[in-house]
Amino acid sequence: MIRKYGNILEQFTTPDRDKLLVFTANGVLDRKGRLIMGAGIAKEIRDKYPGIDEWFGNALIRKSNILEKVITYNKEEAHAFHFNILRGVYKGQSICALQTKLHFSNPSTLELVSESLERLKQIVFAYKEVHLVMPGVGHGKLPLSRILPLVETLPDNCIVWSKRDMF
């Protein structure tokens, strides 16, 4: 694993199937079936790749592993999915959702982050480079001291990004 500081998205100016862009995610879909991507790197990804929230939502619906019904921020019923990682190619870019929390309003859990990183390790060698943000520490509210030992087990083709002066 290599640590870098800066903006992860600056590495993705043109689509590249050999570089996997990993973002941290929750498992909640809105009433239109779109993955809720309203904060942090997920929001940045949603803004950079319009329609990706619907694309991931459709993928989760096809996967059909609804864990529980939940009430979203606007009091509408939605579904929460447990998926660990979900990947594909969107508009020419290899991209992966790494689940760090079940519901967007809750903090990340160390167990889910660990489980998702283990699943990620199973697929990283299919890519020249794998770029991800430090999982679970921003909006996930987990201490960096608990996450670092997990990400340090990632292979050297994995680049873990933090914004300068954050982690």
Where are these regions (language model features)?
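Macrodomain-like recognition of ADP-ribose-binding/processing modules
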Residues: 1-167
